[in-house]
Swiss-Prot record:
Homology family: Belongs to the PEX28-32 family. PEX32 subfamily.
Transmembrane segments: 67-87, 104-124, 182-202
Cystine pairings recorded for this chain: none
Protein localization: Peroxisome membrane
Main localization (coarse): membrane
Name of the protein described by the UniProt record: Peroxisomal membrane protein PEX32
Domain of life according to the entry: Eukaryota
Cytoplasmic compartment spans: 88-103, 203-413
Regions annotated as coiled coil: none
Gene Ontology terms: biological process: peroxisome organization
Record keyword Protease present: no
Membrane topology: Multi-pass membrane protein
One GO cellular component term: peroxisomal membrane
Amino acid sequence: MDTNSKTKVQTENKKIKAKFIHNHGQKPSLIQITPPMISSTLFHAYPLLLIFDNALANIMWLSDDKCLTFIYLTSIWLTISFFIPVETEASHFLPFTKILRLWLGIISGAFLFLSFMYYIVSLIASLRDTEPPTLDEIVVLLESVLDKLEVLRNELNVWKKLKLSFDGVNKECSGKRLFCRLFLFGTIFQIIIMRYISPGTYTRFFIITGLIYNTSSFQATLRLLWRFTAVRNFYYLGIESFKISSFLPKHLKMEQIIPLSQGRAITVPLVEVLPKLLRDKKGDDHIHILQLLLNEQKDNFGNEDLKILEIEVYENQRRWYQNKNWSTKLLPYERQNYCIEIKNTDGTLTMRSCLPPDGLGEEELPNNWHWINDNWDGTDWIYSDSAWKEIGQYSSLESFTRSRKWKRRLFHL
């Protein structure tokens, strides 16, 4: 056999093995960085974490066995009916109904208790027969429990959800105003309900509603109802009543905007600001500005101050699902197409509807106010989601609303 043939045979008999080069530092094991006392505590708490995680999964309808969760729900309903009876009219079948409700309540309560005990016993037996969990598995289970608790905390924090919703619609909503409206609305709503529904039925309704809140059917129903404008108006009840005073018109004009915006005006010496006023003026504009100042009939302009106010008008648009173009049609409870930010007496800000910038520029200014800029200066669009939460300066699939500012300055001597 020649040399080339021998080399070829040796090459074919060789096995090719992949060699991985780790150029980056690997994550250290949790066993090496976790103190022994914490590791021991987590190991002993592992069965409790499993029980708690399974209970949260059933409450949030995350279990794979939906039928078992429905059986639990039915048993809870029958048990609640035993402890919270419903007032019924007297009839010949009333004793039989009470006995049936008593029997079903006891059986359902016993079923829930025995089912829970059977799960605990089977879990302990399973943990004895299997290998002990690693620290990584315990940490993953702990993170799962914390994530579920975080979801439940956000769902139960009704105040925060309403506050964020109202802030997105009306820029900023004070906690005091929100509490007053929720208290008044909630009190009237409770009185109406308690007039026609017994306390037992009322309590059972809220308990069962809380238990089925996370089901896919309930969430799908809420999403379908949210598509109706009447439902959204009912949810945001009271937003349109956030007004400075009741006598203000629907669309603010310059004669209302200037007094309401006086708090943002700045006062500067006339000698310092006059060159800046005349800097960008050409031709007859110089004469016009000087004539406006001379018409004030001031003897000594050197000691006079000039009040400058900047007006900011927000232009808002929305994009609907059936149309890819941006539209000026907005929902009734949210911002108007053109609005201005007004400061309330308690320090909060309110968005009030106003005329378009072109319409405001054509109006006659009150109290010897005069425009500094000849035209309105517009900013770039700021894109937001459906709740007017800012996303960025570029349009995306998540952006359904957008807003920009139109600015123009005035002066008053």
